[in-house]
């Protein structure tokens, strides 16, 4: 692909992803607030919130199949069109079953967008700029988690125009997606796709995918239960909620410098391996300090900052690594596995940590965190030393 076309493609992917995600993260809390205003139970609202993630998890293994059948450019168009259409559906109907179906479809499209955008950014970045571009992309995605809800608050969640603003952002994402230039044909059109392709990718890079799991566990999963952790420490509700911001700040600050540093190694593969080992070790050290937090509660802030930064950095380095090794449909398969392992790590952290915070906050909870961090560090260290990546 010519340099100018690659630059246009990268800019269009960044812009379309940014607008689509801002719209999505405005829309989800808006829908939940409307459901509560309609006296729909909290349990049903929670199930609705989980439906989007279910769509991501269920559809992600088939992203490579869509890319192979439609082409990567058309797959990105589809990933932008479905959320835009779904957002209009939320405007014109209040039927709860329809809302669930639309949210499932929007989640599936988000999974396709997640996989395709990251794979294309990795493949079409120049080798000396791949880490920077991936780090910048991950940082941009992280800002949408904050910007979407903040814009909703500014516009007013009870304003009738709020739905239309969500739709406008998503339509803007679709418009930018249409500006993505034609992409070269995948270098591996006969690559395995679907579940078989995902399984092969997992077998090819098991330790990289473990890094994705640990990244999801500490960046996204633990973050989701930090308010409960703060309350267990005796913090008030406001300070407990701010722990989430500390984790998000760590993630936002660290991903771009991590990507830029990964570009500077003469031996890129060895450099990435070494950085993963260091980041995993920092995560382990932070978890070992957790038992000291109860009597010294201010330690919680730097610890959760490190968890967010380390988790985001592990995911970023894993994406840079597979983007440096693979292309085409094979890269889409590997990206799909990385997304799945990251999501699985997040789900495992949320479920297990919530239980342990209730039954054993001073022993079981830190022990679980230390065990996950230790397994990740040992696996990455052994893989680096044996050059098994």
Predicted features along the sequence, with ranges:
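Helix-loop boundary and gating motifs at the non-cytosolic
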Residues: 5-53, 207-211, 220-229, 233, ...
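Central cavity-lining transmembrane alpha-helices of secondary-active solute carriers
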Residues: 50-63, 245-257
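Helix-to-loop junctions at the C-terminal end of transmembrane segments
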Residues: 59-71, 156, 254-270, 357
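Structural signature of the two symmetry-related core transmembrane helices
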Residues: 75-88, 273-288, 370
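Cytoplasmic helix-loop-helix junction between adjacent transmembrane helices
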Residues: 104-139
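Intracellular juxtamembrane helix-capping segments at the cytosolic ends
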Residues: 112-125, 312-326
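C-terminal membrane-cytosol helix-exit motif in multi-pass small-molecule transporters
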Residues: 167-188, 379-383
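A late C-terminal transmembrane helix in Major Facilitator Superfamily
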Residues: 329-357
């Amino acid at each position: 692909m010519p340099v100018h076309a690659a630059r246009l493609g990268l800019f269009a992917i960044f812009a379309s992803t940014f607008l689509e995600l801002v719209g999505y993260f405005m829309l989800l809390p808006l829908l939940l607030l409307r459901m509560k205003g309609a006296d729909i139970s909290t349990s049903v609202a929670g199930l609705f919130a989980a439906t989007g993630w279910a769509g991501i998890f269920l559809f992600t293994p088939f992203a490579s199949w869509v890319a192979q059948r439609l082409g990567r450019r058309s797959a990105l168009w589809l990933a932008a069109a479905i959320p835009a259409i779904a957002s209009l559906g939320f405007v014109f109907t209040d039927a709860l079953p329809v809302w669930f179906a639309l949210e499932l479809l929007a989640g599936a499209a988000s999974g396709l967008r997640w996989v395709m955008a990251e794979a294309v950014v990795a493949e079409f970045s120049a080798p000396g700029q791949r880490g920077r571009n991936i780090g910048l992309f991950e940082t941009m995605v992280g800002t949408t988690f904050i910007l979407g809800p903040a814009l909703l608050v500014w516009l007013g969640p009870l304003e009738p125009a709020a739905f239309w603003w969500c739709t406008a952002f998503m339509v803007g994402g679709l418009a930018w997606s249409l500006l993505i230039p034609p992409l070269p044909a995948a270098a591996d059109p006969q690559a395995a796709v679907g579940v078989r392709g995902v399984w092969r990718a997992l077998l090819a890079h098991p330790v990289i995918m473990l890094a994705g799991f640990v990244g999801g566990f500490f960046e996204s999963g633990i973050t989701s239960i930090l308010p409960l952790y703060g309350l267990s420490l005796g913090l008030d509700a406001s300070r407990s909620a701010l722990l989430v911001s500390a984790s998000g700040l760590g993630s936002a600050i660290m991903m771009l410098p991590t990507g830029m540093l990964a570009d500077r190694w003469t031996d890129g593969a060895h450099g990435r391996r070494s950085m993963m080992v260091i980041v995993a070790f920092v995560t382990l050290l932070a978890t070992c300090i957790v038992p000291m937090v109860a009597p010294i509660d201010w330690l919680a802030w730097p610890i959760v900052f490190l968890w967010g930064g380390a988790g985001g950095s592990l995911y970023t380095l894993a994406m840079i690594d597979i983007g440096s090794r693979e292309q085409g449909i094979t890269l889409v398969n590997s990206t799909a596995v990385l997304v799945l392992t990251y999501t699985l790590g997040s789900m495992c952290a949320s479920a297990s940590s919530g239980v342990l915070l209730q039954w054993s906050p001073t022993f079981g909870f830190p022990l679980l965190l230390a065990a996950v961090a230790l397994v990740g560090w040992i696996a990455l260290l052994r893989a680096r030393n044996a050059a098994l990546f």
